[in-house]
């Protein structure tokens, strides 16, 4: 329990980064296909 206090497990970092990356790419492509990508 004391090991996770100052250090985040690697699988949590990978999962959060993966979800954030997929969401960001999805929003980017959705905006570009909708015509809002140029305004952003």
From Swiss-Prot:
Which compartment or compartments is the protein found in?
Plastid membrane
Name the domain of life: Eukaryota
Which Gene3D superfamilies does the UniProt record give? 6.10.250.2070
Q: Does the keyword Transmembrane apply?
A: yes
Q: Name one Pfam family in it.
A: PsbJ
Tell me which GO cellular component terms the UniProt record holds: photosystem II reaction center; plastid membrane; thylakoid membrane
Q: Where are the transmembrane segments?
A: 8-28
What's the protein's topology in the membrane?
A: Single-pass membrane protein
Main location group: plastid
Identify the keywords attached in UniProt to this record, alphabetized. Membrane, Photosynthesis, Photosystem II, Plastid, Reaction center, Transmembrane, Transmembrane helix
| GO biological processes | photosynthesis
Name the InterPro entries on file: PSII_PsbJ, PSII_PsbJ_sf
Subunit structure as annotated in this protein's UniProt entry: PSII is composed of 1 copy each of membrane proteins PsbA, PsbB, PsbC, PsbD, PsbE, PsbF, PsbH, PsbI, PsbJ, PsbK, PsbL, PsbM, PsbT, PsbX, PsbY, PsbZ, Psb30/Ycf12, at least 3 peripheral proteins of the oxygen-evolving complex and a large number of cofactors. It forms dimeric complexes.
Q: What family is it from?
A: Belongs to the PsbJ family.
| Function of the protein | One of the components of the core complex of photosystem II (PSII). PSII is a light-driven water:plastoquinone oxidoreductase that uses light energy to abstract electrons from H(2)O, generating O(2) and a proton gradient subsequently used for ATP formation. It consists of a core antenna complex that captures photons, and an electron transfer chain that converts photonic excitation into a charge separation.
Stated name of the protein: Photosystem II reaction center protein J
**Which organism is this protein's natural source?**
Cuscuta reflexa (Southern Asian dodder)
Q: Which gene is transcribed and translated to give this protein?
A: psbJ
């Amino acid at each position: 329990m004391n090991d996770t206090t100052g250090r985040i497990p690697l699988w949590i970092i990978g999962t959060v980064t993966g979800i954030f990356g997929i969401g960001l790419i999805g929003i980017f492509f959705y905006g570009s296909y909708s015509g809002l990508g140029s305004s952003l």
